[in-house]
Amino acid sequence: MKIAEIKGREILDSRGNPTVEVDVILESGIMGRASVPSGASTGEHEALELRDGDKTRYGGKGVLKAVENINTLIAPALKGMDSMDQRGIDKAMLDLDGTPTKSKLGANAILGVSLAVAKAAANYLDIPLYRYIGGTNTYVMPVPMMNIINGGSHSDAPIAFQEFMIRPVGAKTFREALRMGAEVFHALKEVLKKRGLSTAVGDEGGFAPALDGTEDALNCILAAIEAAGYEPFKHITIGLDCASSEFYHDGIYDYTKFEGPKGEKRSAAEQVAYLEKLSWDYPIDSIEDGMAENDWEGWRMLTERLGNRCQLVGDDLFVTNVKFLEKGISEGCANSILIKVNQIGSLTETLDAIEMAQRNGYTTVTSHRSGETEDATIADIAVATNSGQIKTGSLSRSDRMAKYNQLLRIEEELGNRAVYGYKKIARNFKA
């Protein structure tokens, strides 16, 4: 079915900042709608999110230029194209843009159209989006990586690491995993209350208390897991997003940026040793961006030390880009890739990155951004690609719940075909 009309508009995301929403209307009248997320901590090689820069509107964060590009440049170019030719449509937009970082049209403009086209095609065929993208072999429900303590650039808490996540690996179904996560989240709230700490939440719905560093945050999570009636390692493991690029400068990992005078300053070797110690002292089985995006030697060291027993996820390192992923594979850096659709800026390129990762034995983690909307597309992408893992925030804020609730619906629809789990990485636990 051919594209008849494309409409872009400016809406607000979960932080109250403008973002792009797109409607793609087919000749049949069927419509697909998508909105675009936005990150707070971003990799320097990410596709360019086009902002207006007009300080008199939204502090310069308006997206009217991107919307105008959709309505005046992209829409005429795609009108009449077959909505089911996803690769052809995405290529047409990339050719129209003509820049390596999508700086002419804006990655937010291109992505909004790309996702809305896929939704329109799925709606026209009257099939779920995950089935349209993934075909008949879609059955794996993702393990949720729930960010229950926020630090770094996602909160005002004096902790360098950006996310402390729980992973309900012992669940039998996604529904059970969601319940386990919610119970730990509420138990953590009580742990923090008893210490007189704030239970206000950060950008992704996790708590942002004034804890005394990384170990204090981890100990609070352990206490919450046990208070909820679960056993660390067996039922629930912990994942970290260090977001190390945020506090890396001139070869030094400078924790004082977020933690003040009490923070450490570590070399790459010391950073690796610190992460290794944490992985032995706590039930940690996934570490994201443990090293900075440009510290490739540090990444090699970390992968050599921990890669055979811990998932090492490249986010800023790979930015969902096959060029950087290919380099990581050839140089032995990381063993997993974080998938963020807005890092690369089109559905086709996102799927290409997932395919390359899976073909080379890397796990994939489908991810949200800290600035989100009610759009739940990433839930469908996680199932469509059998990703096995999803990062979409904590157990509060409706922008995060939209994804979890969509996954509940998908699991219900799949019925007994659904399998909960992910490609496991062997881990030697501390005796």
Swiss-Prot record:
Cited InterPro entries: Enolase, Enolase-like_C_sf, Enolase-like_N, Enolase_C, Enolase_CS, Enolase_N
Compartments, record wording: Cytoplasm; Secreted; Cell surface
EC number from the UniProt entry: 4.2.1.11
UniProt entry keywords in alphabetical sequence: Cytoplasm, Glycolysis, Lyase, Magnesium, Metal-binding, Secreted
Reaction(s) the record says it catalyses: (2R)-2-phosphoglycerate = phosphoenolpyruvate + H2O
Main enzyme class: lyase
Any one Gene Ontology molecular-function term assigned to this protein's record: phosphopyruvate hydratase activity
Active-site annotation: E204 (proton donor), K340 (proton acceptor)
Stretches of the chain forming a coiled coil according to its record: none
Metabolic or biological pathway, per its Swiss-Prot or TrEMBL entry: Carbohydrate degradation; glycolysis; pyruvate from D-glyceraldehyde 3-phosphate: step 4/5
Cofactors that this protein relies on: Mg(2+)
Protein name: Enolase
Biological classification of the source: Bacteria, Pseudomonadati, Bacteroidota, Bacteroidia, Bacteroidales
